[in-house]
């Protein structure tokens, strides 16, 4: 209500909402009466209707005048509801810098505490094995301040380095030889840095059933979704096992052909995520004016 009142006081000509689809939808829905004053509504970062709740495409299209998308394949879901939709690309790939890889294996168990705990309890034996089997590699766990003590407790007596500082995490990630990461937006950063990866995810059995019932995509990684095939190995739920991961880690450490294949697709994906290699912010600016 406070934001709504502030907007009304400012009397804008244009309102642009960014991401946060539930919040943005509720806010813009309350402000539709401003159309009488010729106020326009634009949104940046489409709701992931291709993954779940496809009906949101119609709802969004009824409220907005323009939509700017990160991924080209998203456009069709909104164009069919007559919303002017523009693919502008993903900002993360505009300043892409690929660094030489070092002997680093990185584990990224997630962002929320419950997610980190669920994934890390499954990964614990894998991390322990990796630290011993690849003793000439540095093993890093990239996490957050809010979960550092929990991570330390779960992984006590295992020879790993736990990093929470943002800049240090980016530095480690960019130089990693291999990453084992929880499903999520981190896959875009791994793609940006061209780090061969394995995607994992574990959750409660009830949540698992709901995901299988309501999620509309076959894959978790955005690269796999984009290319409609498994480029990045995924071990989700019941496939997230010690034996599966130990085998896959061994393949991606030793098999140069497999690593090269991932990197080629990552590079291809990165190039497709920019429109004519232009800064997405500049493209949006041109479309607004």
Give the predicted meaning of each segment.
Residues 1-289:
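Nucleotide-activated sugar donor-binding and catalytic core shared by glycosyltransferases
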């Amino acid at each position: 209500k406070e934001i709504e009142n502030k907007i009304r006081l400012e009397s804008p000509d244009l309102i642009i909402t960014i991401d946060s689809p539930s919040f943005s939808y509720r806010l813009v829905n309350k402000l539709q009466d401003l159309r009488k004053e010729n106020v326009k509504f634009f949104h940046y970062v489409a709701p992931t209707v291709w993954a779940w709740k496809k009906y949101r495409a119609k709802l969004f299209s009824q409220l907005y005048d323009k939509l700017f998308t990160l991924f080209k394949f998203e456009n069709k879901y909104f164009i069919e509801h007559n919303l002017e939709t523009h693919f502008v690309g993903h900002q993360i790939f505009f300043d892409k810098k690929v660094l030489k890889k070092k002997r680093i294996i990185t584990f990224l168990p997630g962002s929320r505490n419950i997610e980190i705990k669920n994934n890390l309890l499954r990964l614990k034996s894998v991390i322990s094995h990796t630290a011993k089997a690849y003793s000439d590699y540095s093993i890093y766990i990239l996490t957050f301040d809010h979960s550092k003590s929990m991570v330390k407790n779960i992984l006590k007596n295992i020879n790993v380095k736990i990093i929470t500082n943002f800049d240090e995490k980016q530095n480690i990630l960019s130089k990693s030889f291999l990453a084992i990461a929880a499903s999520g937006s981190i896959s875009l950063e791994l793609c940006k840095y061209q780090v061969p990866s394995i995607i994992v995810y574990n959750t409660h059995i009830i949540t698992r059933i709901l995901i299988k019932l309501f999620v509309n995509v076959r894959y978790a990684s955005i690269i796999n979704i984009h290319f409609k095939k498994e480029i990045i190995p995924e071990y989700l739920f019941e496939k997230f096992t010690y034996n599966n991961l130990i085998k896959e880690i061994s393949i991606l450490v030793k098999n140069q052909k497999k690593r090269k294949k991932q990197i080629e697709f990552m590079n291809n994906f990165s190039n497709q995520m920019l429109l004519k290699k232009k800064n997405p912010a500049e493209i949006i600016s041109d479309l607004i004016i």
